[in-house]
Amino acid sequence: MSRIGNKVIVLPAGVELANNDNVVTVKGPKGELTREFSKDIEIRVEGTEITXHRPNDSKEMKTIHGTTRALLNNMVVGVSEGFKKELEMRGVGYRAQLQGSKLVLAVGKSHPDEVEAPEGITFELPNPTTIVVSGISKEVVGQTAAYVRSLRSPEPYKGKGIRYVGEFVRRKEGKTGK
């Protein structure tokens, strides 16, 4: 039995959900998200409650059931509250700048790295070494933050690089002399 799939999703005020043959559109104060779901899972909307039902208890149906419910919940939370990921830069001379919707990173290379914000994503810089990636789609926010991190992921000897705020970076001991 999928415990996640059986949880009811409550629609907050100001959020509308339209289900057209398992193509679900969620509209809210922050924007609109559309996603196509498996035809095997039935999505029911009763007032302000959304439930997902599976036809049988096979292993495949259980996994699709839980995933469908989680994706629906992420859509509802995204259009009502939004998602954000914070990254911090550590290293001498490592800094970020905004040029319009483009993020320009100086991370110890011979050239600055430029990251164009995907549709629906905004970059914020509270200070030159902190980057906040925000948007309504949890998936796109996570992918964008992971891409920015991959431009200079933290190295284990000095810890220099771009990391998520609160991320633990395993440190190694350097070579010992003779």
Swiss-Prot record:
The keyword Cell cycle does not apply. Pfam families: Ribosomal_L6 (PF00347). It comes from the Bacteria. GO terms for molecular function: rRNA binding; structural constituent of ribosome. InterPro entries: Ribosomal_uL6-like (IPR000702), Ribosomal_uL6-like_a/b-dom_sf (IPR036789), Ribosomal_uL6_a/b-dom (IPR020040), Ribosomal_uL6_bac-type (IPR019906), Ribosomal_uL6_CS (IPR002358). The keyword Zinc does not apply. GO terms for biological process: cytoplasmic translation. Gene3D superfamilies: Ribosomal protein L6, alpha-beta domain. One of its GO terms (cellular component) is cytosolic large ribosomal subunit. Keywords: Ribonucleoprotein, Ribosomal protein, RNA-binding, rRNA-binding. Belongs to the universal ribosomal protein uL6 family. Part of the 50S ribosomal subunit. This protein binds to the 23S rRNA, and is important in its secondary structure. It is located near the subunit interface in the base of the L7/L12 stalk, and near the tRNA binding site of the peptidyltransferase center. PANTHER family: 60S/50S RIBOSOMAL PROTEIN L6/L9 (PTHR11655), LARGE RIBOSOMAL SUBUNIT PROTEIN UL6M (PTHR11655:SF14). This is Large ribosomal subunit protein uL6. It comes from Streptococcus pneumoniae serotype 19F (strain G54). The lineage of its organism: Bacteria, Bacillati, Bacillota, Bacilli, Lactobacillales.
